[in-house]
């Protein structure tokens, strides 16, 4: 299927990779079909959640577990049922990223992850019932904090 996109130009996508969001994504409820696109490097934690029906709409997304090492939550039963999840191995979790002009202020939404069942290509954004996570978690700040922690661990080993 040929798709005209804002970020990638005209691309050919495999229709079997289209993810159906039954209720859309909050704020974009009428747009229900998306595909996950890689921006060159498949090892990068960043991806694009590209809408199939509106080539202008794409969300920058990130694998939150690659950024926040202790990110942990239970998928709500309603989402498990709605998405037909049978195994955690069939689940992809993404966080929507906001990239402002000042890239050092880039944030990710840990409070409302996008959950995708990769087995049946159903997805939804789920709002977690916890105060532990924020809708604006600073990515660069988190990565710097991890570097400091890793560095501190290295110093301990040398002593």
From Swiss-Prot:
Residues in coiled coil: none
Pfam families: FliW
One GO term describing the cellular component: cytoplasm
Keyword annotations from UniProtKB, A to Z: Bacterial flagellum biogenesis, Chaperone, Cytoplasm, Translation regulation
Subunit-level organization: Interacts with translational regulator CsrA and flagellin(s).
Protein purpose: Acts as an anti-CsrA protein, binds CsrA and prevents it from repressing translation of its target genes, one of which is flagellin. Binds to flagellin and participates in the assembly of the flagellum.
Entry similarity comment: Belongs to the FliW family.
Protein known as: Flagellar assembly factor FliW
Lineage, top ranks: Bacteria, Bacillati, Bacillota, Clostridia, Eubacteriales
């Amino acid at each position: 299927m040929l798709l005209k996109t804002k970020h990638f130009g005209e691309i050919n996508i495999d229709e079997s990779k289209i993810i159906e969001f039954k209720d859309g994504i909050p704020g974009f409820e009428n747009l229900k079909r998306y595909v996950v696109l890689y921006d060159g490097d498949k090892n990068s934690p960043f991806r694009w959640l590209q809408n199939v029906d509106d080539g202008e709409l794409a969300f920058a997304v990130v694998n939150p577990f690659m950024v926040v090492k202790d990110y942990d939550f239970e998928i709500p039963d309603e989402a498990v049922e709605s998405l037909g999840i049978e195994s955690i191995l069939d689940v992809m979790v993404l966080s929507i990223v906001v990239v402002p002009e000042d890239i050092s202020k880039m944030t990710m939404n840990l409070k409302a992850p996008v959950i995708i069942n990769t087995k049946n290509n159903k997805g939804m954004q789920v709002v977690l019932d916890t105060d532990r996570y924020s809708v604006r978690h600073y990515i660069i700040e988190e990565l710097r904090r991890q570097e400091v922690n890793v560095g501190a661990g290295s110093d301990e080993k040398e002593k």
